[in-house]
Amino acid sequence: MATDEATKPSPIPPYPEMILAAIEGLDDKSGSNKSAISKYIEGKYGSLPPAHASLLTAHLARMKESGELVFLKNNYFRAGAPDAPPKRGRGRPPKARDPNAPAPAPKSPSSTGRGRGRPPKAKSPLEAAVKQATAGMPKPRGRPPKKAKTDGAASPSPSPAPAPAGDGSTPGKRGRGRPPKVRPAVPSETAAA
């Protein structure tokens, strides 16, 4: 039995160790892609499990998430490697500034530039004076009263009652609601008899 254990090939190291050894062994400045890492591991360790491709993919993803590897442009780098490019942030990078260009002058708050938003409408001086005069007075509660009609001569008698809406002869003020249905004047049989 001791001979069986001695003749067995040594077990393969864990995948993270093999991946890091492959990246170091390939020593590519632009990083190592997944297929290059896989070929290196197959060439060095020979007999691998049948699920090697899926295991390699899973371990690469796990190492990338944990920060052991940096993934950039479909290539993997060691996180602590000095030649690994810095990880790019999200979004569009800022424009490169010319070092010889002079620094922009700080904006003064009293500059004549336009402010944000729509400019206010021009107010007439009368409206401005009324608004300023009534600014101190509190607004009364409730609905404001109706304004009285201002005719040329004020009549002491109350206004006459509006004519019935049914006749249509005078164009007076109409009453509220739906007007009554107009029936044609038909002589009734009882009135004729």
Swiss-Prot record:
Residues 87-98, 113-124, 138-149, 173-184 bind DNA. SUPFAM superfamilies: Winged helix' DNA-binding domain. A motif (Nuclear localization signal 1 (NLS)) lies at residues 86-92. GO terms for cellular component: nucleolus; nucleosome; nucleus. Transmembrane segments: none annotated. SMART domains: AT_hook, H15. Phosphorylated by CDK, this phosphorylation prevents DNA-binding. Motility is increased when hypophosphorylated. It comes from the Eukaryota. Keywords: Acetylation, DNA-binding, Nucleus, Phosphoprotein, Repeat. One of its GO terms (molecular function) is sequence-specific DNA binding. Residues 11-81 form the H15 domain. It is found in: Nucleus, Nucleolus. InterPro entries: AT_hook_DNA-bd_motif, Histone_H1/H5_H15, HMGA, WH-like_DNA-bd_sf, WH_DNA-bd_sf. Pfam families: AT_hook, Linker_histone. Residues 75-193 are annotated as: Disordered. GO terms for biological process: chromosome condensation; negative regulation of DNA recombination; nucleosome assembly; regulation of DNA-templated transcription; regulation of endosperm development. The keyword Protease does not apply. A motif (Nuclear localization signal 2 (NLS)) lies at residues 145-149. PANTHER family: HISTONE H1, HMG-Y-RELATED PROTEIN A. Belongs to the histone H1/H5 family. Binds A/T-rich DNA (e.g. present in the storage gamma-zein gene promoter) with a highly dynamic distribution into the nucleus. Probably involved in endosperm development, during cells shift from a mitotic cycle to endoreduplication leading to massive synthesis of storage proteins (zeins) and starch. This is HMG-Y-related protein A. It comes from Zea mays. The lineage of its organism: Eukaryota, Viridiplantae, Streptophyta, Embryophyta, Tracheophyta.
